[in-house]
């Protein structure tokens, strides 16, 4: 875990290191901490209403890898979700050890957010994911989410899960819409709705989760 910055970074380290993780998961915790970077200088805050340019910049920041192929999409999406919540570039991820082996999202959640994030019921298409996100935005003004796709086929790795992000964008005088973000990618980080639907077939299973500070 690489750390730089002011005393505020020490607060994050203290919180991360104080999490009560099962001893059986110690190897997974080590992989996460070895890949996690904390950069908490007094950085400029992003605006409350994030733009596509803001999201692209934040997504590029969290991907701190040296080689593109790494099974760290769960950590990348958690880092981005954390940074979006705080409107700052704070966490990023390097390559994980055993790069073809993914990380357990429950353990990543506990380290980054302090608890496992509540997961939605199963959604069977990107259309359902979009509907769920907009519904939660309308009801509770939730605007940032982590999406887990099951049975995803990744290059080299084969069948696996894949985590990415979604944010509700509210542009002036326009209807709110969902922007998907895949910080694991090095190109097309902000795919359109049609591109993400083409990428994930309708037979996939999707789950939505989000950080709720009131949980703590």
Q: What residue spans do the PLM features occupy?
A:
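Large, modular interaction/toxin scaffolds in secreted and membrane-associated proteins
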Residues: 1-3, 186-187
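Active-site nucleophile-adjacent alpha helix/oxyanion-hole segment immediately C-terminal to the catalytic cysteine
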Residues: 2-116
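Surface-exposed beta-strand edges and flanking loops
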Residues: 5, 23, 34-36, 148-151, ...
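Short coil/turn linker and secondary-structure boundary residues
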Residues: 27, 50, 121-124, 191
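Conserved active-site-adjacent core of cysteine acyl-enzyme catalytic domains
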Residues: 83-161, 167-173, 178-183
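Active-site signature of cysteine proteases
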Residues: 159-216
């Amino acid at each position: 875990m690489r750390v730089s910055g002011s005393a505020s970074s020490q607060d994050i380290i203290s919180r991360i290191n104080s999490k009560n993780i099962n001893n059986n998961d110690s190897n997974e915790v080590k992989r996460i901490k070895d890949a996690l970077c904390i950069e908490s200088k007094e950085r400029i805050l992003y605006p409350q209403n994030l733009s596509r340019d803001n999201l692209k910049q934040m997504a590029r920041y969290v991907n701190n890898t040296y080689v593109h192929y790494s099974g760290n999409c769960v950590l990348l999406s958690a880092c981005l979700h954390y940074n979006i919540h705080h409107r700052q570039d704070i966490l990023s991820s390097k390559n994980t050890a055993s790069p073809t082996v993914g990380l357990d999202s429950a353990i990543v959640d506990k380290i980054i957010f302090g608890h496992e994030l509540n997961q939605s019921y199963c959604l069977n298409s990107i259309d359902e994911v979009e509907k769920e996100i907009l519904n939660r935005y309308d009801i509770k003004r939730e605007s940032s989410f982590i999406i887990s796709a099951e049975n995803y086929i990744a290059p080299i790795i084969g069948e696996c899960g894949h985590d990415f992000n979604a944010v509700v964008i509210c542009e002036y005088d326009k209807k709110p819409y969902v922007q998907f973000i895949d910080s694991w990618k090095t190109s097309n980080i902000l795919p359109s709705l049609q591109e993400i639907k083409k990428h994930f077939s309708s037979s996939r299973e999707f789950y939505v989760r989000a950080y709720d500070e009131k949980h703590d």
